[in-house]
Amino acid sequence: MAAIMPGRLWDREGMRLFAAVLPPQDITAELALEVDRLRRLPGADGLRWTGRPGWHFTLAFYGEVAEDVVPDLSARLARAARHTDPFELALNGGGQFGHGRALWAGAAGDVDALRLLAARAEAAGRKAGLRMEEHRRYQAHLTLARGREAVDMGPYVELLREFAGRSWRVTDLALVRSNLPRSGVRGEQPRYEAVGRWVCGASG
């Protein structure tokens, strides 16, 4: 089956969407143990840690997408997945962005295939008429924490260098909806919902 889609994609005029690879639960369970170690480091309470349900590798960010664009985008993502064979990936190491603004886990394995899938997901958005950010070389990263202000991420990155997770086979591409916090409660995180998934390498 080439597409795994729920019956309803939207409930209002637009959705905040991105394409992603979603690691399976046994893989994120390994990472959760590593994050527990990271959160015991000095200063960890000053970071905003992302919840395990939100862990993903973003391939392309589309922003707000109008309802009438979603079918075309979905068809193009299905084609992108179909043209990409399944590949092996593992969570491995990590780094930071923005001089202490974000901490992330990296990837090992067939990163070239992941980069190719990201390029195809980005192209799908452009061909569907979405306004995309300026193209940059893809950096595989899974965001673990963000700093409310620039902090010294050195100890966290150093500890992450020791992390090497088990590999898994990436078999599908997901279209994910980001539901931003609305309650105003401090620390509330976005909720992520896969609204479409397409099997890699499928012929149908």
Q: What feature does the model see in each segment?
A:
Residues 3-204:
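Histidine-dependent nucleotide/RNA phosphoesterase domain, centered on the 2H-phosphoesterase fold
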